[in-house]
Amino acid sequence: MRASDVERYRQYAKTCQDTDYGKPDSVRAHNRAVTSMYKTVEKAAAEGNQAIQALAILLDEPITREWLAFQLLDKGCDVPPDLEQKCLQIIQGIANDPSRYADAFASREWLKRWEQKHQSSSR
């Protein structure tokens, strides 16, 4: 994972943050950025723990932390337990934020699916 990959991930997250949902071109740019973020996470997963750790610095940045928390866990990356817990704490923070009604609801649903998946895989 090169520093340029991490910087591009930041840029993709900024594109998503700046999305104007009333403008189709902006929405298309948002969708391309999300796809590119997932590709970056997949690349890190393929490269292994050191690459995941390099990308994980973005969990401490406001614009990237939420995107990366979901994406690391969604992609089934071999995330070390401490990073998994950090990602889950970020997602739980969204789920418990009453000022973010739609995001909170979606995060609670995501957490339910996560827990179901991991309960069944630990049996």
Where are these regions (language model features)?
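Alpha-solenoid repeat junctions
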Residues: 48, 76-80, 115
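Residue-level detector of extended alpha-helical repeat arrays and alpha-solenoid scaffolds
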Residues: 30, 34-37, 65-66, 84, ...
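Amphipathic alpha-helical scaffolding segments comprising HEAT/armadillo-like alpha-solenoid repeats
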Residues: 3-6, 46-57, 81-93, 120-123
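Short, Lys/Arg-rich amphipathic alpha-helical interaction segments
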Residues: 85-123
